[in-house]
Amino acid sequence: MLRITALSSLSQAVTLRLEGQIVGRWVEELKRSCEELRANGDGMVLDLVNVSFIDTTGLALLSELRHGKVSLVNASPFITELLKGAGLW
């Protein structure tokens, strides 16, 4: 399961707090949420503080998002190592 919470921000960027695992069908849910919120052209921050695992499809999506205006923040040491291994951190 993946919980996605949009947080209000004083900056132009929208922050999404993610909780759970970025795997399987939840990858498409995250992609849909990002596309909807990025429609206005502002940047986006993905807060990974409560993400416990990311599979290969999740890493592929994060790689795709990083080519846009998306920043990844607050990853745990385990998630940081996964992201480093994929060249995303």
Regions found by a protein language model. Name each.
Residues 18-89:
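Amphipathic alpha-helical interaction surfaces in cytosolic regulatory modules
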